[in-house]
C-alpha cells in the first residue's frame, strides 16, 4: 500500500510539472519560468542593467527581450515602460537575441 501511495504521489508531481511547463510555453515565457513580475523602467536602464544588476543574473537579457516582445534592438526600452520579468528561470539566455 505504501509503495502504491508513493508512486501515485510521484506521478501526480510529474503531471503537475508537465502541466506547468506546458502552460509556460503557452504563455511564451522563456527560461522555463513559472511566472512574471512587473518592473517599471527607470531613466538610464538597459536590459543588461536590469538582468545583471537589479535581478543579479537570475534572468537573462534575451529572456527579458523575448518575454516583452522587444524587437531587433534588445536595449530599446523607455523610462516608464513596464516590463515583465520572468522568475524562477532554470536557464539564463544572455546571447541568442544579440
Swiss-Prot record:
Chitin binds at residues 44, 48, 75, 77. InterPro entries: LysM_dom, LysM_dom_sf. Disulfide bonds join 31-89, 62-97. Disruption phenotype: Produces no to only a few pycnidia. Its main location: secreted. The keyword Protein biosynthesis does not apply. Keywords: Cell wall, Disulfide bond, Secreted, Signal. GO terms for cellular component: extracellular region. CDD domains: LysM. Residues 37-85 form the LysM domain. It is found in: Secreted; Secreted, Cell wall. Gene3D superfamilies: LysM domain (3.10.350.10). SMART domains: LysM (SM00257). Secreted effector that enables the plant pathogenic fungus to manipulate host defenses for successful infection. Binds chitin and suppresses the chitin-induced reactive oxygen species (ROS) burst. Chitin-induced polymerization of homodimers forms a contiguous Mg1LysM highly oligomeric super-complexe that is anchored to the chitin in the fungal cell wall to prevent hydrolysis by host chitinases. In plants, chitin acts as a microbe-associated molecular pattern (MAMP) that is recognized by lysin motif (LysM)-containing plant cell surface-localized pattern recognition receptors (PRRs) that activate a plethora of downstream immune responses. Forms homodimers in a chitin-independent manner through interactions at the N-termini of Mgx1LysM monomers. Homodimers are further polymerized in a chitin-dependent manner. This is Secreted LysM effector Mgx1LysM. The gene is Mgx1LysM.
Amino acid at each position: 500500500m505504501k509503495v502504491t501511495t508513493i508512486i501515485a504521489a510521484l506521478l501526480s508531481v510529474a503531471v503537475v510539472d508537465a502541466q506547468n511547463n506546458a502552460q509556460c510555453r503557452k504563455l511564451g515565457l522563456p527560461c522555463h519560468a513559472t511566472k512574471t513580475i512587473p518592473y517599471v523602467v527607470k531613466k538610464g536602464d538597459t536590459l543588461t542593467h536590469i538582468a545583471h544588476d537589479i535581478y543579479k543574473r537570475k534572468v537573462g537579457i534575451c529572456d527579458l527581450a523575448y518575454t516583452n516582445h522587444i524587437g531587433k534592438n534588445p536595449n530599446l526600452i523607455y523610462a516608464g515602460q513596464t516590463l515583465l520579468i520572468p522568475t524562477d528561470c532554470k536557464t539564463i539566455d544572455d546571447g541568442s537575441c544579440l
